[in-house]
Amino acid sequence: MTEDQGFSDPEYSAEYSAEYSVSLPSDPDRGVGRTHEISVRNSGSCLCLPRFMRLTFVPESLENLYQTYFKRQRHETLLVLVVFAALFDCYVVVMCAVVFSSDKLAPLMVAGVGLVLDIILFVLCKKGLLPDRVSRKVVPYLLWLLITAQIFSYLGLNFSRAHAASDTVGWQAFFVFSFFITLPLSLSPIVIISVVSCVVHTLVLGVTVAQQQQDELEGMQLLREILANVFLYLCAIIVGIMSYYMADRKHRKAFLEARQSLEVKMNLEEQSQQQENLMLSILPKHVADEMLKDMKKDESQKDQQQFNTMYMYRHENVSILFADIVGFTQLSSACSAQELVKLLNELFARFDKLAAKYHQLRIKILGDCYYCICGLPDYREDHAVCSILMGLAMVEAISYVREKTKTGVDMRVGVHTGTVLGGVLGQKRWQYDVWSTDVTVANKMEAGGIPGRVHISQSTMDCLKGEFDVEPGDGGSRCDYLDEKGIETYLIIASKPEVKKTAQNGLNGSALPNGAPASKPSSPALIETKEPNGSAHASGSTSEEAEEQEAQADNPSFPNPRRRLRLQDLADRVVDASEDEHELNQLLNEALLERESAQVVKKRNTFLLTMRFMDPEMETRYSVEKEKQSGAAFSCSCVVLFCTAMVEILIDPWLMTNYVTFVVGEVLLLILTICSMAAIFPRAFPKKLVAFSSWIDRTRWARNTWAMLAIFILVMANVVDMLSCLQYYMGPYNVTTGIELDGGCMENPKYYNYVAVLSLIATIMLVQVSHMVKLTLMLLVTGAVTAINLYAWCPVFDEYDHKRFQEKDSPMVALEKMQVLSTPGLNGTDSRLPLVPSKYSMTVMMFVMMLSFYYFSRHVEKLARTLFLWKIEVHDQKERVYEMRRWNEALVTNMLPEHVARHFLGSKKRDEELYSQSYDEIGVMFASLPNFADFYTEESINNGGIECLRFLNEIISDFDSLLDNPKFRVITKIKTIGSTYMAASGVTPDVNTNGFTSSSKEEKSDKERWQHLADLADFALAMKDTLTNINNQSFNNFMLRIGMNKGGVLAGVIGARKPHYDIWGNTVNVASRMESTGVMGNIQVVEETQVILREYGFRFVRRGPIFVKGKGELLTFFLKGRDRPAAFPNGSSVTLPHQVVDNP
């Protein structure tokens, strides 16, 4: 059988999981399971304990960490035990000093030495002056030996004249229980040292007292008193074990909460970091921060805004680079759509790496065009140099595509320096873009360039300061725009050897570490893997992997690099699992140490006397905190009453009141216990009782009342027994001899005070009440016993002392000798008793123990409040992290489709990894504002063009708001390109895009399959109506030119480091041509699209054949409207943004 076995108690498991379990986000790539089991230890010295008391964490490393934490927490309670020992020494000093005589010198000196040692030990432990190993391994046992020695020295030196079986039994029981609640040891050693102490104490008393017995009757009385001692010790040990279990469970709960909270926090932080990295790979940080700030605004604040928020910033003196693949059409014809996208993905991933190397901000990828900017958002003086180096590296990088495809592809690069307006437009699918006349110039610089060369403008040339050799570019001869604007252009001469040196010097060594060349040409292989959901993932191997493959081709014995990589990945995951577990445990230990050193309660968050939180709201939250261990606390009261009854029955077996109070009290306490445990085990009790129990747990005054009832029952049982005993054994009063008392409880009345000590123990076990309530209850116990000791039982204790110490004197003479403050006789002899009268010593003992337990209760409440504050702090931290994650997630899903964002947030992706999804039946739409170019100016009246873009932002935002309509839920915005809006329908793989219940395409009719295309056509008509509404309100005359098409596409993301979602294929190209060759104010479609949409009631006008670049002549139609209204899910029409409804 294994050492640890799964814990199978259904009740406990349900409660434990309900208290401690948390929902952890799935994280398959972490490599380590985040669920840890609470098991039962089936070996060791505590095997005799119940299963629920033998808890252990799995794995063993977690249990070891917990034991370190638990002992560290208990180390502070060790100081409490030192205080207990010091109070006991003070008690002995007082008891010896008030009746000082020559025979009291030895116990007085021993107690004084013990007190000094206690103080020294307290200071050493408090200040941390002892080595950690000594403090945790040696001091607990040393303190136990010191306390045990003090008890036995007090027993042997103070009671040397006449020993009794009850001597120091109360103190022994007190310290045995104290060992369980204070010593920073495991349960097994505490049980062992406690049992050893009790056995030795019992044997010493039994042997010593037995030597003084003179007849058989006294022997029977001794036997009953020894058995009473055993029950006192047994009660202290049982309740001590339960208190240890309760403390262990409370700390396990705090530890597990800390562990799981740290796991969740780390997981959320990791996911939040992934989201932030993804977000910042698409948007610059200053734009993303501004967006997050606005997203957190209240809806009321947003409603007060007159216009939609626009995130646009002006950046001056930046260099803009446009790069286009020359021969892309030839390349497209040589590759399938998927192969082409994989090729572009790998190429643009390399460009992204180069962009990071040369401090470029990638703006967008438009088909085969790549453009970026240097000097944004942070200004760089060498922005022009960086852009030139970037262009040269891109020209060199395209060579591997040329070699692989055996085509004449090349790069044409244009660079211009000027001012841009950078930001995002619209409210959905945010993408960072730049606008300005200088951006147009940079675009024309690329168009007027030469393949394989970097074409720069005069403004860029002015920023180079002679860093590169150039030659005239003559761009005006190849581009009418450049010729019209009179822009001088140049071509970079990159053939000279000093270019690499210039690259390093121009970047001050920052871009090219260790003198590495700008780029390294390679011809990597493209690996494709098909996923079950139909998506294709492709990874381009790095240059190092390509070299390995070449080596493998030359040498057949060379190991397969792919297989080695897979094996290495598997080994890395195993190592990562172990490292993650070790890292988490280390972080947990640091977090726990940080908590402990924070001393949160000592920062005056609480009042000094009452220990209540200064914040009333915090105090209210603490007061309603449920205490799951209240049932165990009340069960301790039942154990205490049982042992109390056994002790009293053994001392006085003839007194019937002992039996009656035991039965009645036990029944009442069982009722209280059941009512408290119903909330812990709800399936075992009626619903009404469970509800009542839960109400008690969360209601402070009800908890206090329940606790007071339990202690009141214990006190009344003891008081009734004491008073009944007095009445039963009181004989007739005689003037000469006093009260004649004999038999039963009169033989040793100290035991009734000892059982009161058990009532004090039961009081501090009440975990659901505050230390002030416990103090009140302990004052009740101590006050009741004190009143009986000093008044009702005064003659009882006097008679007991007389029989023990002055057997031959009459009671009146003995009473005279028992005066504590009497002076020595005239003859020089001491006529006082050798001890303080028992009625006073027992009373003082009760008060000392009460003060000790009150001190411990304050410590326990401070710990409980500290754990509560830790819990609140951890909860608040998780809430803050979760809130940030939620906003980041909202921002990320507004930049990428949700299913695509989940793919990239799930695990770390390689830079060249491709996410793609093939679709056979998709609708694509392009909608542009051709006359916006005439509207846009950069005059000062328009704030350099910003106000023009603000108006464009309003138009695009209104288009975006249409997508919130349930009718258009199947439509996905792809992107905006300047003033062109691109959308598609049916590109969400995990949603039934057609809105019908048919599960397979074969089972659907054509009308079902193409419903999303009809929705896209309705969306295009709604965009036209929206623009008309905007024109009417702004007195403008903007017109849309829209093109639509249907067919198959490949949707996916290019570049995992800087993901760019787009769709590719012939369908997209034709839709784009339908827009560019269209007529303003019309929606142009090809014949295949017209045939499908006609079935949905759309009206068309035949335009006729038109020439489309790359496609020849195509028959096209203009979509004019719809005869039948669209079938909206709720029967309502589309509400246009800012629509003004005319009242009849």
Curated annotation (Swiss-Prot):
Disordered: region residues: 504-563
Reactions catalysed, as given in the entry: ATP = 3',5'-cyclic AMP + diphosphate
Free-text comment about domains: The protein contains two modules with six transmembrane helices each; both are required for catalytic activity. Isolated N-terminal or C-terminal modules have no catalytic activity, but when they are brought together, enzyme activity is restored. The active site is at the interface of the two modules.
Activity control, per UniProt: Specifically activated by the G alpha protein GNAL/G(olf) in signaling cascades triggered by odorant receptors. Activated by forskolin. After forskolin treatment, activity is further increased by calcium/calmodulin. In the absence of forskolin, calcium/calmodulin has little effect on enzyme activity.
Modified residues (Phosphoserine): 523, 578, 1076
Taxonomic superkingdom: Eukaryota
GO CC aspect terms: acrosomal vesicle; apical cytoplasm; ciliary membrane; ciliary necklace; cilium; cytoplasm; dendritic knob; Golgi apparatus
Organism from which the protein derives: Rattus norvegicus (Rat)
PANTHER family: ADENYLATE CYCLASE TYPE 1, ADENYLATE CYCLASE TYPE 3
Residues engaged in binding Mg(2+) 2: 324-325, 368
Cofactor(s) in the UniProt record: Mg(2+); Mn(2+)
Full protein name: Adenylate cyclase type 3
Catalytic EC class: lyase
PROSITE patterns from the UniProt entry: GUANYLATE_CYCLASE_1, GUANYLATE_CYCLASE_2
Binding, Mg(2+) 1: 324, 368
Lineage: Eukaryota, Metazoa, Chordata, Craniata, Vertebrata
Parts of the chain that traverse the membrane: 80-100, 105-125, 139-159, 173-193, 226-246, 381-401, 631-651, 662-682, 706-726, 755-775, 777-797, 833-853
